[in-house]
């Protein structure tokens, strides 16, 4: 491994659907990031390394990094990541990047509309987890409201729906709506269309 990369051990995997899954990795104690940033993951393919940027789902307060993936069958990297299980290692760059972060320390009250589809929810989950902890500890007043709209074709593609709805019930500063464009594929769907 070179000085820009290291191997991160996968500690957990959860499949949400046949082509959607999350993994948690142990990044070691030196990996630092801000909610909304991404990490670059990679794997070897045909003798060379393939890398892609993935938004971090977890909060900086969590000891592990969580990622949410959608399998792209003809893709360069997700088919390789799809095969990985707990105990396997994934190549990761040592430094998080990205400026898609949320500012809550300003005096003015800025509200945020967070719009995403399926795996695009990842940085928003990181925001909400981080602000939820800050709010419980009195570090975030909740003056800035967050409104999350997450869309998908099928209801089972909402990997973080239950968690986000549970937080929304506990706080005055966060609301979420999940909407499916093909609700007829799940007779139990009671959400938005």
Regions found by a protein language model. Give the residues of each.
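Ferredoxin-reductase
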Residues: 2-88, 181-182
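Reductase modules of NAD(P)H-dependent flavoproteins
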Residues: 2-7, 147-193
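Short, surface-exposed secondary-structure boundary micro-motifs
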Residues: 44, 95-96
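A structural signal for isolated positions on well-ordered beta-strands in alpha/beta enzyme cores
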Residues: 66, 91, 113, 147-149, ...
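A short, basic/flexible loop-to-alpha-helix module at the beginning of a structural domain
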Residues: 96-107
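Ser/Thr-glycine-rich phosphate-binding loops at phosphate-binding pockets of nucleotides
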Residues: 117-123
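Histidine-anchored nucleotide/phosphate-binding helix
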Residues: 123-139
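Short, conserved loop/helix-junction motifs that constitute active-site signature segments
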Residues: 135-143, 167-171
């Amino acid at each position: 491994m070179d000085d820009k990369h290291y191997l991160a051990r996968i500690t957990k995997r959860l499949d949400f659907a046949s082509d959607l899954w999350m993994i948690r990795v142990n990044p070691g104690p030196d990996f630092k990031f801000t909610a909304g940033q991404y990490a670059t993951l990679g794997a070897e393919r045909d003798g060379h390394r393939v890398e892609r940027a993935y938004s971090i789902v977890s909060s900086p307060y969590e000891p592990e990094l969580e990622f949410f993936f959608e399998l792209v069958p003809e893709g360069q990297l997700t088919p390789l990541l799809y095969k990985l299980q707990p105990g396997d290692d994934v190549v990761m760059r040592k430094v998080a990047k990205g400026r898609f972060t949320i500012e809550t320390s300003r005096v003015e009250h800025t509200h945020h509309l967070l719009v995403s589809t399926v795996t695009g929810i990842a940085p928003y989950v990181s925001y909400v987890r981080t602000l939820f902890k800050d709010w419980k500890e009195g570090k975030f007043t909740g003056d800035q409201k967050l409104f999350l709209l997450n869309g998908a074709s099928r209801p089972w593609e909402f990997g973080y729906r239950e968690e986000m709805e549970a937080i929304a019930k506990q706080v005055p500063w966060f609301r979420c709506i999940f909407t499916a464009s093909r609700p007829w594929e799940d007779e139990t769907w009671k959400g938005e269309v």
